[in-house]
Regions:
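Feature captures hydrophobic
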Residues: 1-96
């Protein structure tokens, strides 16, 4: 596991410890790997999920650090979303 993935998993675990999420989501970080959130658990995996977010390392770092709103990233084409948009919106509220 790369340092970038390890840092992202840690950042997501911290966010999820303070919030509730009742779905599954995958973050595909270009050139690094994938992270899954299932309920409030965060781990590395490439399993199928309700929704998948795809972006570069830089974009995910900005989102995880609270520097970039996920909705803005999606609307400007920096973040790609495949799957259930309702689940995507619920998870975006966690980052809100």
């Amino acid at each position: 596991m790369t340092d970038i993935i390890e840092d992202a998993v840690e950042a997501l675990r911290e966010k999820m410890s303070k919030n509730s999420f009742d779905g599954t989501a995958k973050f595909e970080i270009e050139g690094e790997g994938s992270i899954v959130i299932s309920e409030n658990m965060v781990y590395t995996s490439d399993e199928e999920t309700d929704v998948t977010f795809k972006a570069s390392v830089e974009i995910f770092q900005e989102i995880f650090n609270g520097e970039l709103d996920p909705t803005s990233a999606f609307m400007t084409g920096k973040l790609k979303i495949d799957g259930d948009m309702g689940t995507a919106m619920r998870l975006a509220n966690v980052f809100g």
